[in-house]
Amino acid sequence: MAANIAAAAAAAQEVDPVLKKAIKLLHSSNPTSAAELRLLLDEALKARFGPEKSLTNNMTPRMLEDEANFSGRAATPPQQPINADEIINLTNSPDKEPSDSVDTIADSDDGLSAVGIVNTGDTGDFGDLNCCVCGEMVFTATNRLIECSKCGAMYHQECHKPPITKEEAADDQEQNWQCDTCCNKPTSSGRTTSSAAAVTPTVFIADEPMPLTSKAKSSVASSRSSNSSNSSSPFYRPEPSSSTNASSSSSSKHGHKSSSSSSSKSHKEERSSKSTAASSLSAIGGMEKHNSSGTSSRRSGSSTKSSSKSSSSKHHESGSSSKRRSKQ
């Protein structure tokens, strides 16, 4: 401990005396302390940099004038006199009616003490900042004013139905909160889609063409409608149905007969063509057989001739041999 005290004393002795004097003048309340501090600084600058770097040469006349008029630093600040007219006795003062131009803002941790009174002068400028239920701007820590993120209306936590919870009034969830009116309001897009679905009829477009039966039915229906329209006209004369039926039956019979006769003729022609083809094939076969028999008879005739020739030659040879024998 004694060593620490000795070290502190040695450090105090090593401090520059000029710095000690400057610190004393800086905290002094003497009016001439500013001039003395400037002179001390001038001496230090001259000792280090020469007379050209004097602070007095660089000071403006206004700075010199302010230094001459310096009154010094007072040890204790003077107390301002209190006028007796500004003291108001709140205990005996009559109750004042609240004016519309005064808005009270109470914001504290316990929610009981008021921070201050703001005199707006005109409530129209701050009409959007009031609660849309009670119409007041006063709020506390437990009954804050929350703005709806959709419609922009302001609600007290207790004025809104249902009351706004602390989780909904938190700083991170306050920007996403919506009032009950906006939450229960149906969206316009849902209405438009439902109305469009109710008004727009459903139309089915077939990918494939309609069959012929439907076309025939439609043509029959159109013919019936045309007949009914013609019969309703005053100049329409109905035709006898029996004659039309008879003509249609006769035409159908005639068509059937003609078709049957044509089919029988075609069958006969086919049969005759088949018979002619068969006869031609048989004739061709007979000719081939006749040719083959002629060639065979020719071959047999030539063979008989050759055999007769050979026999005659043999007989001639035998005759000549017998003659030779008789001559001998």
Curated annotation (Swiss-Prot):
Residues 1-45 are annotated as: Sufficient for binding to IntS1 and IntS9 and for 3'-end snRNA processing. It is found in: Nucleus. Pfam families: PHD. A zinc finger (PHD-type) spans 128-185. The keyword Cell division does not apply. Keywords: Metal-binding, Nucleus, Zinc, Zinc-finger. Residues 215-233, 241-264, 274-283, 292-311 have a biased composition (Low complexity). SMART domains: PHD. GO terms for biological process: RNA polymerase II transcription initiation surveillance; snRNA 3'-end processing; snRNA processing. The keyword Amino-acid biosynthesis does not apply. SUPFAM superfamilies: FYVE/PHD zinc finger (SSF57903). GO terms for cellular component: cytosol; INTAC complex; integrator complex; nucleus. Residues 215-328 are annotated as: Disordered. Its main location: nucleus. GO terms for molecular function: zinc ion binding. Belongs to the multiprotein complex Integrator, at least composed of IntS1, IntS2, IntS3, IntS4, omd/IntS5, IntS6, defl/IntS7, IntS8, IntS9, IntS10, IntS11, IntS12, asun/IntS13, IntS14 and IntS15. The core complex associates with protein phosphatase 2A subunits mts/PP2A and Pp2A-29B, to form the Integrator-PP2A (INTAC) complex. Within the complex, interacts with IntS1 and IntS9. Interaction with IntS1 is likely to be important for promoting 3'-end processing of snRNAs. Belongs to the Integrator subunit 12 family. The PHD-type zinc finger is not required for 3'-end snRNA processing. PANTHER family: INTEGRATOR COMPLEX SUBUNIT 12, NUCLEAR FACTOR-RELATED. Component of the integrator complex, a multiprotein complex that terminates RNA polymerase II (Pol II) transcription in the promoter-proximal region of genes. The integrator complex provides a quality checkpoint during transcription elongation by driving premature transcription termination of transcripts that are unfavorably configured for transcriptional elongation: the complex terminates transcription by (1) catalyzing dephosphorylation of the C-terminal domain (CTD) of Pol II subunit Polr2A/Rbp1 and Spt5, and (2) degrading the exiting nascent RNA transcript via endonuclease activity. This is Integrator complex subunit 12.
